[in-house]
C-alpha cells in the first residue's frame, strides 16, 4: 500500500468561512500503530448528485509561519501540580504524588507494570529518545518503560539490586545493578526498535538491551485504541523519585550528520534518519 495513512475512519464534515469543505478523521501512520491514532484534515468536493469525495490532487496547506505546539514533554517536576503532558493509567491519583526539590515522588502500587502505578506521556515521533533520573526507596521497584496496557509493555525497572529488562510483558531478563538505588535510565525507540541504557551520572551509559522489537504493542493485538506511551513506574513499597525527565526527537540534525552521510536516506512517508 502506497498510502501514508492506514485505517482511516470516523470522518466529520466541516466547512470554513470561505465556503470550503473538509473532512476531519483519524488514522494510523503507515507501519506505526504504536503511535496511536492521529487526527487529519483533508479537502472534499461535492458531486452533482449530492455526495462528496476527497480531492485527490489537493495541495497541502502551508502555514504562514512555522508554529510549534505549546506542549513540552520534558519536565523538571518543579510542581506544585503535575504537567498537562502526564496522565495516570486507569486511575486519577494526584494524592499519590509529592513534589520536593525538583523531584517527583510517586507512591508505589502493585508489584509489576501490569498492576503497578504508571504515569504516562504520549510520544510524538517515530525516532525518539527519553530519559529520567530515578531514586528507589526501600522495598520499591521503579523504572522507565514504554506502556500500551497491562499486557503490553517494555523497558527497564530496578529495585536497587537488579535491573529487570522487559522485552514484553511475558519476557523479562535480569542483570546485576552495580549502580544502586539512584540511577538514570534511557530509552531510544527508533522505528519500533528499542534500546535500553542506564547510567550513574547521566553522562556515561551502559547498554542493557538493544534492538528490541516493540512494533506489535498496539491496538490490533491488544485492543483499546491506545498508543505505546512513555511511562514512569513505581511498585512495591514506599515511593520512587523521578527528576530531570527528558524527551527529544532523535532524528540527527544537519550539524550531526557527518557520521551519517553514508547511510542517510529520505523516507517520504516517515523518516527515521
Predicted features along the sequence, with ranges:
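Short loop/turn segments immediately following the C-termini of beta-strands
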Residues: 26-28
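Short strand->helix junction
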Residues: 3, 30-31
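Conserved blade-ending motifs and adjacent loop-strand segments that build the rim/top face
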Residues: 1-14, 211-221
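Structural WD40 beta-propeller signal
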Residues: 14-16, 47
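Long, internal scaffold/assembly segments composed of regular secondary structure
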Residues: 17-18, 64
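Entry beta-strands of beta-propeller and related beta-repeat scaffolds
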Residues: 19-23, 51-52
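Short, solvent-exposed loop/turn segments at conserved positions within beta-propeller repeat blades
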Residues: 34-37
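Extracellular glycan-recognition regions
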Residues: 30, 42, 48-273
Amino acid at each position: 500500500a502506497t498510502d501514508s495513512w492506514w485505517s482511516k475512519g470516523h470522518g466529520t464534515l466541516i466547512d470554513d468561512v470561505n465556503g470550503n469543505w473538509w473532512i476531519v478523521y483519524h488514522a494510523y501512520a503507515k507501519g506505526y500503530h504504536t503511535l496511536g491514532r492521529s487526527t487529519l484534515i483533508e479537502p472534499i468536493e461535492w458531486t452533482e448528485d449530492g455526495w462528496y469525495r476527497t480531492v485527490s490532487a489537493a495541495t497541502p496547506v502551508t502555514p504562514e509561519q512555522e508554529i510549534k505546539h505549546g506542549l513540552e514533554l520534558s519536565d523538571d517536576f518543579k510542581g506544585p501540580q503535575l504537567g498537562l503532558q502526564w496522565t495516570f493509567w486507569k486511575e486519577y491519583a494526584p494524592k499519590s504524588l509529592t513534589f520536593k526539590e525538583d523531584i517527583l515522588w510517586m507512591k508505589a502500587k502493585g508489584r509489576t507494570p501490569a498492576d503497578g502505578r504508571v504515569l504516562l506521556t504520549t510520544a510524538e515521533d517515530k525516532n525518539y529518545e527519553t530519559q529520567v533520573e530515578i531514586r528507589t526507596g526501600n522495598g520499591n521497584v521503579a523504572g522507565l518503560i514504554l506502556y500500551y496496557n497491562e499486557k503490553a509493555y517494555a523497558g527497564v525497572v530496578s529495585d536497587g539490586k537488579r535491573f529487570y529488562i522487559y522485552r514484553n510483558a511475558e519476557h523479562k531478563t535480569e542483570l546485576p545493578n552495580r549502580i544502586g538505588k539512584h540511577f538514570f535510565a534511557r530509552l531510544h525507540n527508533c522505528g519500533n526498535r528499542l534500546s535500553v541504557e542506564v547510567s550513574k551520572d547521566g553522562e556515561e551509559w551502559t547498554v542493557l538491551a538493544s534492538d528490541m522489537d516493540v512494533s506489535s504493542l498496539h491496538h490490533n493485538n491488544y485492543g483499546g485504541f491506545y498508543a505505546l506511551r512513555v511511562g514512569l513506574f513505581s511498585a512495591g513499597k514506599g515511593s520512587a523519585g523521578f527528576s530531570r525527565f527528558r524527551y527529544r526527537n532523535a532524528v540527527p540534525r544537519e550539524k550531526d550528520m557527518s557520521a551519517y552521510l553514508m547511510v542517510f536516506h529520505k523516507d517520504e512517508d516517515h523518516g527515521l534518519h
